[in-house]
Amino acid sequence: TLFPYTTLFRSAVLIKKAADESQRELDKSEIYNLFVKHWLEAKGNLSIVDLAETHLEGKENSESTSCRAVVEWKGKRYSIGKTGNGPLDAFAGALSEIPAPKFRITAFHEHSIGTGNDTSAVAYVQITCEDGNQYWGAGKSTNVGRAGVDAVVSALNQIK
């Protein structure tokens, strides 16, 4: 499926609204374009300016990834960095250094699109904020780790 089950209702509302406004059924490309606009290109308070990930080697760090990033939150730039058990965990941890809502990742789903060298990963994350509100985001990239990172940005950009 294109969406994890828990995002289907939210997506159905968006699709129904667009169909009602156009007074006709939407075709597949129009539905996909809504997905891209609302989830993959969600504009909001957070954007990535620069991102670097390093897989750490050695006995103690063999499963660790270091993330260094420059992000913009509400128009202000921050240099952030953390180490985690992978790119997604490291990036999510680094975001604790900015004044964004504190959250934890409570669901993650990923699948591939395409075959061979043209394969992309689409990642979906659900975040749960300290206030209990949950938000879904989606990211797409040829880099599996980056798809997850972009999904976190998308989820945070769902917060209004």
Q: What is each model feature region?
A:
Residues L2, T6-K160:
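Terminal or standalone catalytic/regulatory effector modules within metabolic enzymes
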